[in-house]
Regions:
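Bacterial signal peptide processing site
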Residues: 27-30
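Blade/loop signatures of beta-propeller domains
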Residues: 48-104, 258-269, 416-419, 494-495, ...
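Repeat-blade elements of multi-bladed beta-propeller folds
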Residues: 76-80, 115-135, 160-186, 211-232, ...
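Detector for the c-type heme attachment site
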Residues: 81, 389, 658-665, 689-690, ...
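Extracytoplasmic beta-rich repeat domains
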Residues: 108-119, 149-172, 200-215, 253-292, ...
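Short, conserved, GDST-rich strand-edge loop motifs in beta-rich repeat architectures
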Residues: 225-237, 277, 304-324, 428, ...
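Flexible coil segments in periplasmic/lumen-exposed cytochrome c-class electron-transfer proteins
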Residues: 625-645, 649-654, 661, 696-764
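Gly/Gly-Pro-rich "capping" loops immediately C-terminal to redox-active cysteine motifs
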Residues: 660-693, 699-700
Length: 764
């Protein structure tokens, strides 16, 4: 949300621009990571789903146990519980009949203030979860007691390369070890009993802006890991390492490299034919595998989701057109060798950041009277796809949110029919969905009881325009998109725009390709999903509420206030005969950092927490007593309209990805610059150009901001803060408190008694 005094009709009614969909974030303050206590974890017996008595084995997981996961439903042994990534729990003790008695049984405050996106793993009574900056925690899954923690000590300066917050989506467990990818590109194997390092591999080139936020998958003894960084100009790939010793087994690049060099394999030689120009490889090409994977043991096939191009703008990336394989594609590989099997491209010649890295689900279902083995995905581009996972053959696709970039998917070719209104090379175009997508990384779920897929949907629009001054810079993001687009210029337009920023939970019939029911949410960027045999769908919401809905009708049947926005997906497990529902809560990610949308008032806490619920749980969260700070008086800085315009351009191109569009940060982990103290104002240039806060993650921007630019940037931030103050003194704040109240205040701290579950301590 941008209070923009330059394009406003008056200085009082400043422009409020919602830069919805910018998927870039990463610099800012560091978290205070929890104690690396490395206390020995109590080993749990193999039937820990029903017995928490310690034995000599810890995390004794292998492929056969995961394949046979339904025989021990009390464990959550893999990222999606099973290799098919359905995220469905066969446990039914907690059901639509008993959920009224569901209560909190323990919680543990993480002490972190950045986004938390992890799916915990629970094996034989021990929960393994991850936090921001790639920290790993092991807890007693029954009591929440911290058993050990591991901090990879990622240099905070590397956070500037994390497009979408310094998040981590989880660990993997295999034969007594815990595996995690770190934000600076390492793959680390830990001893599951105490968190000590067994081996570590640097999976990326440290001279390029690679990151890892996705969870590893372990298949046939290989740890599979991808990476991110397409916004910064990298070449995507996925790599397999031996789980035993960390030796590299194979690597599959998703886009071709330098055409003067030999192609790594036949698949890349074919892919190169779909690219145009002779310099695409110099900007990396993109195609990072930053999140979703799935595995079919019967077919021995690994499925990877491939991301966007670098830059986003295809007219710059590949002048002359082309599909640009394997961008925005589902690619099937042999997990033992990395050999290409087939691909299906959801968005040929991607031009809008429409990744295919979103959650993929494998299922067997009857379609058109025939039994089909399918892979399903709701990628960013707004269409829900059903693909034959044996051959890659297109089966069907329909829009699950409003779509403007294409009219439909051709049923004969499986390719989209693009709308002429989606091309922004010469004109500004407002397109839905925007770069955040109709659905982002937040996992879906499939229930075999209802045969429905449940989607945490977005569908926000975005204004696309070509950056005609684009020049590749390896130290910053390279999109080919013009960020300096005027937004709504009056309070009425501001309110109208904010009212569109919502999300919903959709139940989708993948055979009929139609929506069955919908739950509309008041806010956007809501959490991932869990379905259970108890006819329930669990979802955390951006408003700081954890909720359950009936899977067949979508009726809300249970809620619990958590006081911090939830974006991660829940899981379910059983210990000593009791079923638990657990979720990691912590606001952040791309939307939380970048969108500039005021956070929901109920999403008031800065710090994250892990929570576990069971029938009869009696624990009560302390009611947060938040101290709210009004916008402070600003220093007197003189600047011309030209200087303010330059400051705005510098902010939009370099700062809003961390500090929020319109200088509004809705997450607690990165400062909202409108609230700077007098001392920070005095130190402005030392921070921006001198790198005074590098150890906090705020690196020097002297490579793109000169001395005068620093002054212009400072003046712009102050002018926006003053315009914010003016707007907040109008009746609009009173009339639309749900939209504007938290645009005018920020939470300083929870002034209640520190919870016993605070980082490094015990759980409650």
């Amino acid at each position: 949300m941008l209070f923009n005094p330059i394009h406003a009709n008056t200085r009082l009614y400043a422009t409020l621009w919602i830069a919805i969909g910018l998927t870039l974030a990463g610099c800012g303050e560091s978290d205070s990571a929890s104690d690396s206590s490395n206390a020995a974890a109590a080993a749990m017996s193999k039937d820990g789903a029903t017995n928490s008595t310690a034995t000599s084995a810890v995390a004794n997981i292998d492929g056969e146990r995961i394949i046979q996961a339904d025989s021990e439903p009390g464990n959550w042994m893999a990222h999606g519980r099973t290799y098919d990534e359905q995220r469905y729990s066969p446990l039914s003790q907690i059901s639509d009949k008993t959920v009224n008695d569901l209560g909190l049984t323990w919680y543990w405050d993480t002490g972190t203030t950045r986004g938390l996106e992890a799916s915990p793993i629970v094996v034989d009574g021990v929960m393994y979860s991850t936090g921001s900056w790639s920290v790993v925690w092991a807890h007693d899954a029954k009591t929440g007691k911290l058993l050990w923690s591991y901090d990879p000590e990622v240099p905070r300066s590397h956070g500037v390369y994390a497009c979408c917050d310094v998040v981590n989506r989880g660990a993997a467990v295999w034969k007594g070890r815990v595996y995690v990818g770190t934000i600076d590109g390492r793959l680390v194997a830990l001893d599951a009993s105490d968190g000590s390092v067994v081996w570590s591999q640097q999976t990326t080139d440290r001279d390029r802006a690679y990151t890892i936020t996705g969870a590893p998958r372990i298949i046939n003894g290989n740890v599979i890991i991808g990476n991110g960084g397409a916004e910064y100009g990298v070449r995507g790939y996925v790599t397999a390492y031996s789980a035993t010793d960390g030796e590299q087994q194979w690597r599959f690049y998703t886009v071709p490299g330098n055409p003067d060099d030999p192609y790594e394999n036949k698949a890349l030689e074919e892919a190169a034919k779909t690219w145009r120009g002779d310099e695409y490889w110099k900007v990396g090409g993109g195609g990072t595998v930053w999140d979703s994977m799935a595995f079919d043991p019967e077919l021995n096939t690994l499925y990877i989701g491939v991301g966007n191009g670098s830059p986003w703008n295809r007219y710059i990336r590949s002048p002359g057109g082309g599909d640009n394989l394997y961008l925005s594609s589902i690619v099937a590989l042999n997990p033992d060798t990395g050999e290409y099997k087939w691909h299906y491209q959801t968005t040929p010649g991607d031009n809008w950041d429409y990744t295919a890295t979103q959650h993929m689900i494998l299922a067997d279902m009857k379609i058109g009277g025939a039994d089909r083995k399918v892979i399903m995905q709701a990628p960013k581009n707004g269409f829900f796809y059903v693909i034959d996972r044996v051959t890659g053959q297109f089966i069907s696709a329909e829009a699950y949110v409003p779509v403007q970039w294409a009219t439909h998917i051709d049923p004969e070719t499986g390719k989209p029919v693009e709308s002429p209104d989606a091309q922004y090379a010469n004109d500004l175009k407002t397109i839905q969905p925007g770069p955040l997508g109709g659905h982002n990384w937040h996992p879906m779920t499939y229930s075999p009881d209802t045969n429905l897929v449940y989607i945490p949907a977005l569908g926000l629009e975005f204004k696309y325009a070509q950056d005609n001054a684009f020049k590749y810079d390896p130290q910053t993001w390279n999109l080919g998109i013009d960020f300096n687009i005027p937004g709504p210029a009056t309070p009425d337009e501001i309110v109208e725009t904010l009212q569109k920023v919502k999300g919903h939970l959709a139940a989708w019939d993948p055979v009929k390709q139609e929506e069955v029911w919908r739950v509309q949410h008041d806010a956007s960027w809501n959490g991932g999903l869990l379905s259970t045999a108890g006819n329930l769908i669990f979802q955390g919401r951006a408003d700081g509420t954890f909720a359950a809905y009936t899977a067949d009708t979508g009726k809300e049947v249970w809620t619990s206030p958590v006081h911090v926005g939830i974006i991660a997906p829940p899981i379910s497990y059983m210990v000593d005969g009791e079923q638990y529902i657990a979720v990691v809560a912590g606001w952040g990610g791309a939307f939380g950092l970048t969108a500039g949308v005021p956070r929901h008032k109920s999403n008031s806490m800065k710090e994250g927490r892990i929570l576990a619920y069971k029938i009869g749980g009696k624990e009560v969260l302390p009611e947060p007593r938040i101290a709210w700070m009004e916008l402070p008086e600003q220093p007197k800085l003189e600047a011309s309209a030209e200087q303010l315009a330059n400051g705005q351009a510098l902010f939009n191109n370099n700062c809003q990805v961390c500090h929020g569009a319109g200088v509004i940060s809705s997450t607690g982990g990165v400062p909202d610059l409108r609230y700077m103290s007098p001392a920070t104002h005095e130190s402005w240039d030392a921070i921006v150009r001198g790198g005074a806060y590098t150890q906090k993650g705020m690196v020097s921007f002297s490579h793109v901001v000169d001395e005068q630019g620093s002054k212009d940037l400072h003046a712009y931030v102050v002018s926006v803060a003053n315009a914010s103050i003016a707007l907040c003194e109008t009746e609009y704040r009173k009339n639309y408190p749900e939209l504007l109240e938290t645009a005018c205040v920020q939470p300083l701290a929870d002034t209640s008694q520190a919870a016993a579950g605070s980082a490094g301590g015990g759980a409650r």
